A protein has these predicted regions:
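Transmembrane helix exit motif
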Residues: 58-68, 105-131
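Helix-coil boundary and interhelical linker segments in multi-pass alpha-helical membrane proteins
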Residues: 1-6, 35-43, 47, 90-101
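Cytoplasmic-side transmembrane-helix entry/capping segments in multi-pass membrane proteins
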Residues: 71-80, 103-104, 128-136
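Selected transmembrane alpha-helices and immediately adjacent juxtamembrane segments
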Residues: 1-40, 125-158
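Selective hydrophobic functional segments
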Residues: 46-99
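Hydrophobic residues within alpha-helical transmembrane segments
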Residues: 10, 14, 50-57, 75, ...
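Hydrophobic, membrane-facing alpha-helical anchors
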Residues: 1-5, 49-62, 109, 156
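Selective transmembrane alpha-helices of multi-pass membrane proteins
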Residues: 81-89, 97-120
Length: 158
């Protein structure tokens, strides 16, 4: 088995440990590691999202079975999130990787700060109605866009 393959497995393992501990940050952490290993931004984002299909699918299924899904909020976020993701993926594949890589690195650094802030700050519980405000669809659009370009960030953004 090649060393580089084992390194990629280690990246996924560490990213999933972080995600399991914080409830977010799989995409941000794994994309950061992949970019630091020299993977082009579009390939790194695609790799992260392919692996997230499994991890997020299992997580979503578990939340659904436990009754933790707010379907009204899902409906408000779904279509704008998909549109933002498609636009972000198109933009990411349309720009030379060497040009966009510094911007993605800066975005990932900011997202890392947001994740650390959310991990170590007590946030008062909000009423469910506060999550259904008029701007939640715009938040889904921005979250999908940022997640597609940066390889992660839906959790911290949304």
């Amino acid at each position: 088995m090649e060393l580089i393959f084992l390194l990629y497995v280690l990246v996924g393992f560490v990213a999933q440990l972080i995600d399991g501990a914080l409830g977010m940050a799989y995409g941000v952490s794994s994309n950061t590691f992949l970019l630091s290993l020299g993977i082009p931004p579009a390939a790194a984002s695609a790799s992260v999202h392919m692996s997230e299909v499994v991890t997020t699918g299992i997580s979503g299924f578990s939340h659904w079975k436990l009754g933790n899904v707010d379907w009204k909020l899902v409906r408000r976020l779904l279509i704008p999130g998909v549109i933002g993701g498609v636009i972000g993926a198109y933009l990411l594949t349309s720009i030379d990787g060497n040009i966009i890589k510094p911007y993605i690195a800066a975005y990932l650094l900011v997202m890392g700060g947001v994740i650390l802030y959310k991990a170590f700050t007590l946030v008062p519980k909000k009423k469910m109605d506060e999550y259904h405000g008029p701007n939640v669809s715009w938040l889904g659009l921005a979250g999908g866009f940022c997640d597609a370009i940066g390889g992660g960030g839906w959790g911290p953004v949304v």
